[in-house]
């Protein structure tokens, strides 16, 4: 498995853009695309996982593990007392859990477990972060960098600290790879913190639906109008692929053929 690294503690807009490009290239199925938008592989691809190593201020690191076919974050690891410490969401079970353990920390003799005692749903992460909505958790490179330091190598931290880090990391890594719109919001606000707007939250919740609509489009026309949201929360009706294409980074896997260009 290839590890994609990103140093949030020492970065530029271009370096973040390169990180996004590398992540999309590692994740996508090279033989699949609809209307020029790359698509993720189905779940039987040979390489099933991706590792993303994030570095924060003062060289602290956290490695996220993503499921390649949908970019879900399954858990993360950090160096702790000379060992590799792994943290896995509690909705990852059975053989998959063992796979995550072994992928995050390959040496069974020098690893520690600190399980995430909740699941990876946004509603759960919001509850643990003690917010009503993730729109209340600010995103930004500085926040990502300092959040890494609050967890990496620390003997203890609260669920609140961890859930806030996960909300930031999931959106700035996985969601930004899925949606160029989110990547562009990070770039536009690069030297400041920002709250995710209504369009960000709405895209995040509708990625599967949007992917299917694009896949099923005929000559660029969606099978039916897609009702989404603008940044200010007003209704955004999408009728054609080219209206939403600039916002897309990767499509979720959809079975069957589509128009490739």
From Swiss-Prot:
Gene3D superfamilies reported in the protein's UniProt record: Ricin (A subunit), domain 1, Ricin (A Subunit), domain 2
InterPro entries, per the entry: Ribosome-inact_prot_sf, Ribosome_inactivat_1/2, Ribosome_inactivat_prot, Ribosome_inactivat_prot_CS, Ribosome_inactivat_prot_sub1, Ribosome_inactivat_prot_sub2
Family assignment from sequence similarity: Belongs to the ribosome-inactivating protein family. Type 1 RIP subfamily.
Active site residues per record: 72, 122, 175, 178
Disulfide bonds: 34-258, 84-105
UniProt catalytic activity: Endohydrolysis of the N-glycosidic bond at one specific adenosine on the 28S rRNA
PROSITE patterns found in the cross-reference section: SHIGA_RICIN (PS00275)
Recorded coiled-coil stretches: none
Protein's name in the database: Ribosome-inactivating protein PD-L1/PD-L2
Keywords associated with the record: Disulfide bond, Glycoprotein, Hydrolase, Plant defense, Protein synthesis inhibitor, Toxin
Molecular-function GO term, any one: rRNA N-glycosylase activity
EC numbers for this chain: 3.2.2.22
Annotated positions binding substrate: 73, 120, 178
Superkingdom of the source species: Eukaryota
Residues bearing glycans: 10, 43, 255
Tissue localization of expression: Expressed in leaves (at protein level).
Post-translation changes: N-glycosylated. Loss of glycosylation does not affect DNA-cleaving ability. Loss of glycosylation does not affect protein synthesis inhibition, but increases adenine polynucleotide glycosidase activity likely as a consequence of the increased accessibility of substrates to the active site pocket in the absence of glycosylation.
Role: Inhibits protein synthesis. Has adenine polynucleotide glycosidase activity on herring sperm (hs)DNA and poly(A) substrates. Cleaves supercoiled pBR322 dsDNA.
